Amino acid sequence: PIAGSMVLAAILLKLGGYGIIRMMQVLPTTKTDMFLPFIVLALWGAVLANLTCLQQTDLKSLIAYSSISHMGLVVATIIIQTPWGLSGAMALMIAHGFTSSALFCLANTTYERTHTRILILTRGFHNILPMATTWWLLANLMNIAIPPTMNFTGELLISSSLFNWCPTTIILLGLSMLITACYSLHMLLSTQMGPTPLNSQTEPTHSREHLLMVLHLAPLMMISMKPELII
């Protein structure tokens, strides 16, 4: 059920990050290199999750692995226990909660019309559902974390805090962000561009679907304009 995936990606996955934030308050500070293996493991896990996204053919699985990769960045920056790192983790968790839930919602609207989640079989919607393509574009751009979205603010704070703590981490961090952009654009092009399948009767988008997307993306845009609300 898509509702379960939306709640899982938007709320339950972020509760794990919140639990780590609370737990780190009782652990020693990271002035030593004691937590370096855990940070490298979290960043390497994010890179591997991103690489897994690149070879996915199932739309829902791709979005799920995307959520895992973003949580790897969150865990890495929480461990170093800096004010910028915690602010970036909070910003990215909230922003990606909206973004991943919106992507799952869009995946469900596509599945309702094509009855498949295979990427290559869901192409060609930009010709017949241009408004849905616009929602896909906005959600993917936010997943890539372009400025001035809250996703960009969170990743900028995370990058700055990790680089200041250990400059070598920028290699894994930069690789993760590069692969994120690659699979997000691949997902957009695979589901929206290309020829429309022949003999396919596609229902137009409904008002409830547009309302769902507005309720996902409008709060994220408003938070992006006033980030003081959460950081």
From Swiss-Prot:
Query: What Enzyme Commission number(s) appear in the record?
Result: 7.1.1.2
Q: Which InterPro entries match?
A: NADH_UbQ_OxRdtase, ND/Mrp_TM
- Keyword ATP-binding part of the UniProt annotation: no
Among the GO molecular function terms of this UniProt record, one is: ubiquinone binding
- Parts of the chain that traverse the membrane: 1-21, 34-54, 63-85, 89-111, 128-148, 169-189
Record keywords:
Electron transport, Membrane, Mitochondrion, NAD, Respiratory chain, Translocase, Transmembrane, Transmembrane helix, Transport, Ubiquinone
Pfam families xref list: Proton_antipo_M
Which reactions is this enzyme annotated as catalysing?
a ubiquinone + NADH + 5 H(+)(in) = a ubiquinol + NAD(+) + 4 H(+)(out)
Return one Gene Ontology term, BP aspect: electron transport coupled proton transport
Compartments, record wording: Mitochondrion membrane
Q: Which domain of life is it from?
A: Eukaryota
- Give Gene Ontology CC terms: mitochondrial membrane
What does the record say about its membrane topology? Multi-pass membrane protein
The family note in this entry says: Belongs to the complex I subunit 4 family.
Q: What does this protein do?
A: Core subunit of the mitochondrial membrane respiratory chain NADH dehydrogenase (Complex I) that is believed to belong to the minimal assembly required for catalysis. Complex I functions in the transfer of electrons from NADH to the respiratory chain. The immediate electron acceptor for the enzyme is believed to be ubiquinone.
Recorded protein name is: NADH-ubiquinone oxidoreductase chain 4
- Originating organism: Bothrops bilineatus (Green jararaca)
- Give the gene that encodes this protein: MT-ND4
